Amino acid sequence: CYLEGINEISACKVCVVEVQGKTKLVTACSTPVQDDIVVFTNSPKVRAVRRTNVELILSQHDCLCATCVRSGNCALQTLANDLGIFELPYEKDIVDIPWDKEFPLIRDSKKCIKCMRCIQICDKVQGLNIWDLVNTGGRTTVDVSDKFPNIAQSDCSLCGQCITHCPVGALKERDDVPKIFEVLANPDKVTVVQVAPAVRVAWGEALGLAPEQFTEGMMVAALKKIGFDYVFD
């Protein structure tokens, strides 16, 4: 759940460590460093508690990884593999909240792990306050703030910050790739791409290129090869 300076709420308890002289484990993300402190990050006690906490998170998470957009690039999946979690000792209890699949931003409540990153990034960075906690107890999850009737009638600017900072696949952009291929296959359609400046940088970063690298020519060439008729900056 940790995001430096933005989300330091110690919610997930995955970063627990053992401090010499203390009987209880503490969260590394919220415990101040002190002089002469001795910290054990991988003791048997730490490993056992960390494993249990991840198992509890997984018990409220839809683990259909093969059909998830974040498969292979998922913080929770990586944690589960690192901790050797291949079976769950707890019964599944997953909250499923309906969502408008036509909206460009798609939320899957079945995958939400209640890290609250989306809430904090939207509140503290974007200042839009779109997300909030709903329900109580074990049914607590994240949904559109009750200030808005629904996501379509909210102040969401579709900036994508909540998607970028979600550690799992609970938030994603609507996939319009099938519609694009359908248009490209139609010989009666003239297809035009207009590229926004921000896309150039984001596209390069996704390929592992440095932000200052010039990727516009590569992008134009790729789009033309895919089959678009015209590409404009």
Question: Where are these predicted regions, by residue range?
Answer:
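Beta-rich nucleic-acid/ligand-interaction surfaces
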Residues: 8-10
